[in-house]
Amino acid sequence: MMQYLFGGEYPLFSNIKMEMGNDGNNSTGAEACTKRYEDEEADASRSPGFVMAADAKKINPNVKVSILRWEYPNWVKAKADGTEKYAAIYKWYKETIFDAYEKYGYVVDYIDPDKNETGSPDGGIIKYFANALENETDFPRHFTGEAKEAYHNIKIVASDENKGLKIVPLMRSDSGVYDAVDAIGFHYRTNATDDYIKMADVDDKEVWYSEGCATFGYSELQENKTTEYGAGTIGGYQSPLALLDSLPNAFVGSRRTMYMFQPAIGSFYEGIQYGHKELLSARDPWSGYIHYDPVLYMLSHITKFAKTGWENDTNTNGIWRVLPNATYGSFGSSDNEHQTAGINGDASYMTLAAPDKTNFSTVFINNTQNEKTFAIKTSDLNLSVDALHIWTTVTDDYLKQGEDVKIEDGIAYVTVPAYSVVTATTLDTTPERFPTEDGSGDYIQTEKRTVLDTDYTGKNQNTTDDYLYADNFEYTNEEDVTVYNATTGKETTENYLVSRGNEPRYMLDTHGAWIVENGQLKQENDSSVNQWNGGDPATIVGDWRWMTAPPLT
């Protein structure tokens, strides 16, 4: 799974964004707090995101890591507003980053210190963090000189507003905020003011779609739609094609060059509080079942045919650029994240090219009922080929190579079917398929989705006895876990329970925190915390198919 997501010559993804949890609920349950009390040592292993990032860096060391928060732990909440609270939030972040480096050997790349989806960006905390990161001297002994430099170079993201457009005006009015912010991130809209585009084109700031929708349910079920727009296809309203179409429109309307999915991977129990919508489902660790949504193939039409990622300071990393004059948005961008061009509207296209002009790819997204034909004029390029390779996705036929299209008199004509994605590229490459058992990648799930049903020990599958699940919370016979260190490039082993921050197996917390202590399940927090979505504390274990089991007495 990780190799498919982060591996290959042209990786599908190059960034991992994770939440600094406070044991309160976000969209998908409670994210564990790495530092629940001011006087305890931070423990990054409580958060699976830090572990996942290390595993991703084993595959691709260039993967970037960004973190942000919804709220904060109660010991931070108790501090006075202003500098005292800024210092407490910074301490929480800093000590977590220090611990993550000690355990996994990397320093995060980006921080948004402000509250996620704030309605009023806090210039004070943005400036406080930028200054503190740059001037930090109190490093632990395990921090190398290279790690210290990486820490001083952590970049600031602001301000992850939900549709709001307040951060750029704040940057224009406050030079300290302007200097502090490296990346401008906002959510759930493709357009912005002209000043956001200027921030990218003139001021050389990064502009991100820092939270956007993933798919709306399993994409292969889209063909069951009966509405006229997109009936029987992967297109239409709130469809996989509509999702993909937001990328070129967001570039045209606000110069976004990063799209972050909420969530990219779903590993929380179905029905927990929020309808699951993800690119990849891996929520049954006892079965090994993984569902690869077909929209991953649609995204591959972009990232598998270009060198994506971050350019270095000397502009020698060879990262491809999006060409504004060869990119078009079908609906011209909107403050409605579900906007489409309509059943008889335009198609979008986006062109990425190598800095030396030797290669390029154009991606066409046609979320309409009409076939389109485009002429690609290959002027001002240094091409060594006389034809373009064509890759197409239509309903139930994903990322398939077609016949090459000749470039004649500097022009290539590309036909784009209704409700499809087509990539025309100079690259002679074959994208990876889903890692299915037969190697074809033509179906979308791995092993059979085994139900969670154990014997009285909790260690063996048994659907014939009277037990559904058992756990003694000791884990003494569990094998040690392999942990990768991105600095040394080596793997070590760690105690099973310690490696997971003393969190119980298969249990998902909501509105609180539960840990394993001395072979017992313990509720950790004795008071509620600020959270996005309130409710009573619970920890949940199970399988939705237990609904068919007879009542227990």
Protein language model features and the residues they cover:
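Active-site neighborhood of glycoside hydrolase catalytic domains
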Residues: 88-110, 117-219
